[in-house]
Amino acid sequence: MWLRVFTAFLSFTAGACSGLKVAVPSHTVHGIRGQALYLPVHYGFHTPASDIQVIWLFERPHTMPKYLLGSVNKSVVPDLEYQHKFTMMPPNASLLINPLQFTDEGNYIVKVNIQGNGTLSASQKIQVTVDDPVTKPVVQIQPSSGAVEYVGNMTLTCLVEGGSRRVYQWLKNGRPVHTSSTNSFSLQNSSLHIAPVTKEDIGNYSCLVKNPVSRMESDIIMPTIYYGPYGLRVNSDRGLKVGEVFTVDIGEAILFDCSADSYPPNTYSWIQRTNNATYVIKHGPRLEVASEKIAQKTTDYMCCAYNNITGRRDETHFTVIITSVGIEKLAQKGKSLSPLASITGISLFLIISMCLLFLWKKFQPYKVIKQKLEGRPETEYRKARTFSGHEDALDDFGIYEFVAFPDASGVARMPARSVPACDGVPGQDLHSTIYEVIHHIPAQQQDHPESSSQDGEEDACLDRHDEAGLQELGHCKEQDKGKHSRAKQCI
């Protein structure tokens, strides 16, 4: 045996040194039982060759190698015992095994001989393993009902029906589980033992089983672990919380919520302390307190949480203080308007005021008259009516009231038509007198007895006007020059 091995080694060394090379992709090949397995082999040389010989040998541990088949050039010479199991297509040195069985597991040796000027030899060895693929594993938990934190233990077992050379690995939340003070594994890692269980052991567990030809993972399973209560706290939907004190305005209803981390969920009870006595006022996670129904301004409460599986209990205390700020709020609640209503009212008032101001400015009588007169051409003023002895003096003065506004020089424009003057009074003086009367028109008429008597005399004087009416008017004006109120009434 050792002689043959030494001879093969010398042949391989000589072949490698002489230029013959035999190569295989891998020295270990894994096969699946019942399927075909192909062992690829590549060889090459640089010298002329007349004959090429390929030989396949099979050996198991502690046994002699067996001849499987061989070829010279393109002729195959199989072992009659294995002629239907092994196939080779020369000059290709690769070997096909079909079907593969557990008995085919071992070392396969390929040897290549080249006959030319001399004989060159080289060989390679391939280890073949045969396995059955694993099936999907199933995880079982004991006890199935769960375990109590710090009290109970738990065992997870991975069950696989098929597969050879199985390797087990436990995963928690997708990461490998390692040995710790509470975690331990069986001999082949097929079981995971947790003792004692804690809240930190809660998670998604799975079992991964693999072998050289396959791998399968179980469905995720979450063990049941009872724990808690932890982190008991009380919150409210309103009011001011400072530490364990809630400040509430009188007249407001406040809702308290008590919660804690626990499995299964806790049962809650609310306890009120009054006059050194305590009594349960409600069961459940929520408590509503109407502040106006509380007789005391400061009341102590307590929320208790109890886990009926773990048997653990926790409680938290808090104080509710009723303030009197709410009384003023209630008194002003019906009287005060909302900010939106106030803003809306102010906006409407400003809009209406601006509209009224715009209309008042737009339709003022004196401005309308002034705008209309300013738009009239200058020729219309020159066509104004003159005094006549047969017209009413009041109507004449009324007409001059609209047209008598001064120009840039401060002198009112008079009609172009000449007007006769009174006796001894030139026409230029008449123009100045009429302008002064128009320029000093009062804004409002004054009523008194003297003015009434003067009106009668003025009317009588004006009724007698004729071609010399203007002279009489000037005479009347001369008589009443010192009486300012009478001149106002004539106008």
Curated annotation (Swiss-Prot):
Leader peptide range in chain numbering: 1-18
Disulphides: C158-C207, C258-C303
Biased composition (Basic and acidic residues): 472-482
Region of interest: Disordered: 444-466, 472-491
Compositionally skewed regions (Polar residues) per UniProt: 444-454
GO biological process, one term: centrosome cycle
Glycosylation, residue list: N73, N117, N153, N308
The Ig-like C2-type domain, residue ranges: 137-221, 223-319
Protein name in the entry: HEPACAM family member 2
Organism the protein comes from: Bos taurus (Bovine)
